[in-house]
Amino acid sequence: MKLIIALAALIVVINAASDQELWADFKKTHARTYKSLREEKLRFNIFQDTLRQIAEHNVKYENGESTYYLAINKFSDITDEEFRDMLMKNEASRPNLEGLEVADLTVGAAPESIDWRSKGVVLPVRNQGECGSCWALSTAAAIESQSAIKSGSKVPLSPQQLVDCSTSYGNHGCNGGFAVNGFEYVKDNGLESDADYPYSGKEDKCKANDKSRSVVELTGYKKVTASETSLKEAVGTIGPISAVVFGKPMKSYGGGIFDDSSCLGDNLHHGVNVVGYGIENGQKYWIIKNTWGADWGESGYIRLIRDTDHSCGVEKMASYPILA
C-alpha cells in the first residue's frame, strides 16, 4: 500500500515538473511577464487547466474519435471567458446587408477543391495582437488577393489605415468592425500599402490625408448568398472571400479538420478569409486564413468542417471587393 502511495506521489511530482517545464517554455516563446507572483500563479493554474483540456481531447484524436487536435499556443494562459471577451470586443453594429448587391454565381462552375495559396495569391498570415482588428485584416487580405489575381500585384495593404480612418463608416478601430464597411471606406478613399502605413496593433489618429498614396482602388463589393453552396461557388470562381465566424471554440486548435458541434453561427464576431476548400478522407472542409499569427493552428490557418450545421457560421456574412 505504501509503495502504491509512493508511486502515485512520484507521478504527481513528474507531472508537475513537466507542467513547470512547459510553462517555462511557454513564457519564453510568447515573451510573457506578469505584474506579480500572484498573477503568475493564477496564469500558471489556467495554463495547467488548458494542458488538461488539450490532453483529454487529444486522446480522442489519437483514438480516431476526433478529426482535429489541440495544442499549446499564445492563448493558453487565459480562460475561455477571457478569450470570449477578447473576441467580443466587436462594438460595431452588424451592417445591414439587405440592399447590398448579390454575387452572380453559376452553380456547378466551381472546382471540387481549390487552394488559392497554391496559386500564389494569398499573402502571409498576420497577427492582430490585442487589437480587435480582425475585420481590418480580413478586409485588407481580400483586396490583396483580388489584386494579385487581377494584376499579379502582391503588395501588402494597410489594415492600420482601416483601423484608424474608417470609424465614420461604421467600424470601431480596435473595438471591432466588418469587412463590408471596410470595403466601402476603400471604395471612397483608396488604401495605402502596409509599408507606407504600417500596422501598430492599436488605434491612432488617421494619417491617410493624401489619396494619391493609395495603391489600390475599388469600384464596389458584393455579398455572397448565405449558404455554403454559394460560398463554395464564390471561393472557387472569384477568389478568397471575407467572412465572419464564431471563433470562441477555436482557441486551442492545433491542426486537423475542426469539427465542433458547439460552433454554431448564432454569434458571429471574428473576421477571417476563406481561401479554399477540399475533401480529406471523405470529409469536406474550408481553408480559413486566420488573424492570430502563423504560430497558431496550421501555420495560421484552420481547416473547418464544411456542409454541416456547425461550420461556425462561415457562410452567413461573406463578401468580396471589386477592384477598379
UniProtKB/Swiss-Prot annotation:
Keywords: Digestion, Disulfide bond, Hydrolase, Protease, Signal, Thiol protease, Zymogen. Its EC number is 3.4.22.-. The active site is at 134, 270, 290. PROSITE patterns: THIOL_PROTEASE_ASN (PS00640), THIOL_PROTEASE_CYS (PS00139), THIOL_PROTEASE_HIS (PS00639). It comes from the Eukaryota. Gene3D superfamilies: Cysteine proteinases. The keyword Transferase does not apply. InterPro entries: Papain-like_cys_pep_sf, Pept_asp_AS, Pept_cys_AS, Pept_his_AS, Peptidase_C1A, Peptidase_C1A_C, Peptidase_C1A_papain-like, Prot_inhib_I29. It is an enzyme of class 3 (hydrolase). GO terms for biological process: digestion; proteolysis. GO terms for molecular function: cysteine-type peptidase activity. The keyword Cell cycle does not apply. Belongs to the peptidase C1 family. This is Cathepsin L-like proteinase. The lineage of its organism: Eukaryota, Metazoa, Ecdysozoa, Arthropoda, Hexapoda.
